[in-house]
Amino acid sequence: MNIKEQIINLPKVELHCHLDGSLRPETVLDLCLKENINIPYENPEDFKSSLKISKNCSSLKEYLEKFYFPIRVMQKKENIYRVTMELLEDSKKDGIEYTEIRFAPFQHTEQDLNENDVVEAALEALQDGESKLGIHSNLILCSLRHDPVERSIDLVNLANSYNEGVCAVDLAGNESDFPPELHKEAFDLAYDNGIKITIHAGETGIAENILKSIKLLHADRIGHGIFAYKSEEILQYVIENQVPLEMCPKSNVDTKAVKNYKNHPFKKYFDLGVKVTLNTDNRTVSNVSLVDEYLNLANIFDFGIEEIKTVIRNGISASFATEEFKVNLLKKLD
């Protein structure tokens, strides 16, 4: 077997995958037509291409503009179910056995749905993914930095109302203008209720947001964390406390957080003993699969199959799955 076949066959997990950044382009087009959403392209292929990032993308802000149409079409239960199920199908093709899919429910209440309708539509797909595809999954509910803390508190209460299927809460969005502490009250509430927490931090050059997210917002994991190296103190803290980093190299190259793949700190962190995990972030926007990301580790950073297995082990142990599930998946990997 060649390296790609070996990677496909390994039982993998994904911890950082945004639903609205991972819709199939043909599905977005189909739903736009069904919902009479005006698209600014005469050629359907041009529209589908526009959902993916170009090499000329200059920033995270420009990258996030790609979410406009996916969010527009995710305003009905049947559409949310469909795109969630399709993501599970795409994940299964990648050899993923467990995935945590994240999205911001309040972004999908522009029409007739309330936030519970939104979550339940996605959960129905997760249940069918388990029974029909054999892929285990959970939801992570995202709060958005630019929203007031009261909205984040509502989000935490929403997550707390589900005993199964919702495994954690997250804080995402513009970290340059909205530091973690603005949402401390909400994440204190999550922590007090035993809800797992992951926070986007250190994605856009602000290393101190990593430590703030851990100490003020009780983060169990950090989304991205690429700029930990800017502070020796923060990097050592992450290593000594084995704080898992949900790393998404292709996405970071696309947003110009790093110059190119070789400049990404993934290998440096791996060699230093950071608990790095590998993820796609946004499959469609970044035009990447998890197998692609592991192939990049092999081809660009010379990772062998044992090093790849170590990264997968990191992901399994850092996941918010049950301990029993994690033990069984680790046995399967070994």
Swiss-Prot record:
**One Gene Ontology cellular component:** cytosol
Q: Which SUPFAM superfamilies match?
A: Metallo-dependent hydrolases
* InterPro entries linked to this entry: A_deaminase, A_deaminase_dom, Ado/ade_deaminase, Metal_Hydrolase
Give the top-rank taxon of the lineage listed in the UniProt record for this protein.
Answer: Bacteria
Q: Which reaction does it catalyse?
A: adenosine + H2O + H(+) = inosine + NH4(+); 2'-deoxyadenosine + H2O + H(+) = 2'-deoxyinosine + NH4(+)
Marked site: Important for catalytic activity: 224
User: What keywords tag this UniProt record?
Assistant: Hydrolase, Metal-binding, Nucleotide metabolism, Zinc
Q: Which HAMAP family match?
A: A_deaminase (MF_00540)
Kindly provide the name given to this protein in its UniProt entry. Answer: Adenosine deaminase
What is the originating organism of this protein? Answer: Clostridium acetobutylicum (strain ATCC 824 / DSM 792 / JCM 1419 / IAM 19013 / LMG 5710 / NBRC 13948 / NRRL B-527 / VKM B-1787 / 2291 / W)
Q: Which gene encodes it?
A: add
